[in-house]
């Protein structure tokens, strides 16, 4: 008997997360490792749990996540986005709650490119009067 699963894709910066929700006890694995082992920073774990806590589903689902690209903060944001989308697939009533908290909106901010003649994206070379 196959248990029903709900899928959501999340993106943030250069990270892409594929999230699968299955009915369970609240176990979360990222790339085959436990979530607390994969994301060591407390802030990243808080970010990941936001959608589940907002919809009061923290201990109702086992979450399996595959995430690639970017750094830890971008990956945590991508996972949050993916979980939010999967919760909407699970129950459309979650959409308004998640939308109010801004969890369904893709964060479009990316690293600005370096420009020719500048040291970084906006940092100009030091000006010398003489």
Swiss-Prot record:
Keyword annotations from UniProtKB, A to Z: Ribonucleoprotein, Ribosomal protein
Domain of life: Bacteria
InterPro entries: Ribosomal_Su5_D2-typ_SF, Ribosomal_uS9, Ribosomal_uS9_bac/plastid, Ribosomal_uS9_CS, Ribsml_uS5_D2-typ_fold_subgr
A biological process term (GO) from this entry: translation
GO CC annotation terms, alphabetical: cytosolic small ribosomal subunit
SUPFAM superfamilies hit by this protein: Ribosomal protein S5 domain 2-like
GO molecular function: RNA binding; structural constituent of ribosome
A Pfam family the protein falls into: Ribosomal_S9
Coiled-coil annotated spans: none
PROSITE patterns named in the record: RIBOSOMAL_S9
NCBIfam families tied to this protein: PRK00132.1
PANTHER family linked: RIBOSOMAL PROTEIN S9, SMALL RIBOSOMAL SUBUNIT PROTEIN US9M
Family: Belongs to the universal ribosomal protein uS9 family.
Name this polypeptide is given: Small ribosomal subunit protein uS9
């Amino acid at each position: 008997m196959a248990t029903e699963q709900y899928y959501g894709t999340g993106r943030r910066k250069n990270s892409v997360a594929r999230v699968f929700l299955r009915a369970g006890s609240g176990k979360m694995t990222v790339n085959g490792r436990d979530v607390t082992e994969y994301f060591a920073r407390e802030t990243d774990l808080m970010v990941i749990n936001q959608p589940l806590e907002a919809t009061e589903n923290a201990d109702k689902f086992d979450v399996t996540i595959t995430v690639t690209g970017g750094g830890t903060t971008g990956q945590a944001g991508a996972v949050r986005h993916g979980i939010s989308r999967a919760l909407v697939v699970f129950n459309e009533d979650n959409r308004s709650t998640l939308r109010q908290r801004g969890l369904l909106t893709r964060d479009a901010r990316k690293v600005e490119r370096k420009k020719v003649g500048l040291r970084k994206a906006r940092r100009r070379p030091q000006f010398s009067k003489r």
